[in-house]
């Protein structure tokens, strides 16, 4: 039986930390869907379509990974794809507290819903999209924070 998972996020932009978690997920699951949330409430730096495009570029060499956008409840997106497992990355205890609440809420919406938590490698544990956006706003170098394939998208 093939097992698939969804790795949801805003990916504003996708980072080396995200890519690390995606690669780890491919070692556990036969298929990984990177689900790029529209997330208008977060006021993203990059448009939804641009974030989808960057995610596709970042994972293009991973054969069992696909990228899709979504703008509905994660549980509904998962059901529509026949997948009941999501991957979430954890960098710190603060991530765990937030992700645990979200995981419980999703399970309350669909009792077959499972959340698997993965940690990025130590050298990527500090990276977040928020840090990348902050560095970008100050014209800093993010080449060690994001996949090389998307750097051209981040240049003003």
Curated annotation (Swiss-Prot):
Reaction equation(s) it catalyzes: (R)-4'-phosphopantetheine + ATP + H(+) = 3'-dephospho-CoA + diphosphate
Coiled-coil segments on the chain, per record: none
Site (Transition state stabilizer): 18
Residue stretches spanning the membrane: none
Chief site of localization: cytoplasm
UniProt binding sites for substrate: 10, 42, 74, 88
Source organism superkingdom: Bacteria
A Gene Ontology biological process term: coenzyme A biosynthetic process
Alphabetically ordered keywords of this record: ATP-binding, Coenzyme A biosynthesis, Cytoplasm, Magnesium, Nucleotide-binding, Nucleotidyltransferase, Transferase
InterPro entries: Cyt_trans-like, PPAT, Rossmann-like_a/b/a_fold
Entry cofactors: Mg(2+)
EC number of this enzyme: 2.7.7.3
Record: residues binding ATP: 10-11, 18, 89-91, 99, 124-130
Assigned protein family: Belongs to the bacterial CoaD family.
Function: Reversibly transfers an adenylyl group from ATP to 4'-phosphopantetheine, yielding dephospho-CoA (dPCoA) and pyrophosphate.
Protein name: Phosphopantetheine adenylyltransferase
Species assigned in the record: Campylobacter concisus (strain 13826)
């Amino acid at each position: 039986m093939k097992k698939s998972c969804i790795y949801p996020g805003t990916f504003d932009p996708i980072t080396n930390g995200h890519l690390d978690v995606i690669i780890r997920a491919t070692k556990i699951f036969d298929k990984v869907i990177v689900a790029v949330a529209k997330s208008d409430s977060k006021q993203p730096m990059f448009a939804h379509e641009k974030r989808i495009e960057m995610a596709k570029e970042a994972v293009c060499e991973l054969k069992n990974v696909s990228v899709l956008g979504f703008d509905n409840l994660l549980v509904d997106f998962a059901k529509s794809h026949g997948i009941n497992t999501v991957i979430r990355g954890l960098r710190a205890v603060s991530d765990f507290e937030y992700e645990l609440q979200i995981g419980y809420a999703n399970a309350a919406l669909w009792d077959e819903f499972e959340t698997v938590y993965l940690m990025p490698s130590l050298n990527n544990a500090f990276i977040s999209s928020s840090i990348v956006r902050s560095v970008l706003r100050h014209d800093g170098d993010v080449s060690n924070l994001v996949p090389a394939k998307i750097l051209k998208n981040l240049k003003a």
